[in-house]
């Protein structure tokens, strides 16, 4: 056990490895393989704080300039797809880049393996407003929690992206004259659709499958089956059932959005709670059963019991949901084949299964286990500022804040 990497470990870890290897000499091969994977694997996150270098312009594949990030950093940055050298070969990378010096603050490589979920999402309240309908969220969740526990979440205005693309020569200057769109049209206009299609194709070339849930009636055939200030149901690719449901709700005292995603060719069905900390993300297959409670004439609660990676059952309550949206939520649950335990609980009066109840009080952000992790101090702020310019972001970009992303496995 004379490998150089072992000698670089703290004495306590060296002793632990030595004790295991003394019992089974063959076990060192597993340690050695683990070290090789962690130091040379394809799923990497690089914090460039030693000698950060500017991204050479000729290596940039695609860039979205100066958009508002809420996670894992909180300021205006560039989102850049570019090429880096790995093992002597060019490989696509995704970086969050400081626009003042074009130096990445965070870089992911091996994108086909690194990115688990990439979503373009509408924002509740904006879809019914013709002035804000083009403002959306772009989100990335990573496979390896050791590499990134925070999702990449940014908010962008497709109209501002259009102006930037015209300025950079990605779109013709006279593109506005090629299309006529009524001012009060709620679906996106043809130019915005083409921008999204361009995003999707560029990400796909780099190994990222972006799922678009914005209303695009021509290219993507995405249409609203429900469009309310407090709820959205989106049918994609001309399907008869919604692929996306978003509903305002509360988890304890915290207001947020419950997001239900149907399975597609790329991803399994997911349930997400955002956008304030902590963000919950889990696959629908992890749900053991659901039930409804606190039912009144106007609102109800959805209780979801999931199995985490410790094989513990966790009960999550999403409350204060408008009764108007019961059917669209219940239809999603039935399509997933999830058992509705509402009547079983009423008849039994108590649970025969031991369930870990998640604290729904205001201090539930302080929970520290595999599913809920505490935030860094100072991250929960009311207004985001550009750290370089010390200016508040535009008012239309302050609709909601994404915080730490927690996945239940």
Curated annotation (Swiss-Prot):
One of its GO terms (cellular component) is nucleus. It comes from the Eukaryota. The keyword Hydrolase does not apply. Pfam families: PH_18, Rttp106-like_middle. SUPFAM superfamilies: PH domain-like. The keyword Kinase does not apply. It is found in: Nucleus; Chromosome. Residues 344-409 are annotated as: Disordered. InterPro entries: PH-like_dom_sf (IPR011993), RTT106/SPT16-like_middle_dom (IPR013719), RTT106/SSRP1_HistChap/FACT (IPR050454), Rtt106_PH (IPR040770). One of its GO terms (molecular function) is histone binding. Disulfide bonds: none annotated. Keywords: Chaperone, Chromosome, DNA-binding, Nucleus, Transcription, Transcription regulation. Residues 361-386 have a biased composition (Acidic residues). Histones H3 and H4 chaperone involved in the nucleosome formation and heterochromatin silencing. Required for the deposition of H3K56ac-carrying H3-H4 complex onto newly-replicated DNA. Plays a role in the transcriptional regulation of the cell-cycle dependent histone genes by creating a repressive structure at the core histone gene promoter. Interacts with histones H3 and H4. Belongs to the RTT106 family. This is Histone chaperone RTT106. It comes from Candida albicans (strain SC5314 / ATCC MYA-2876).
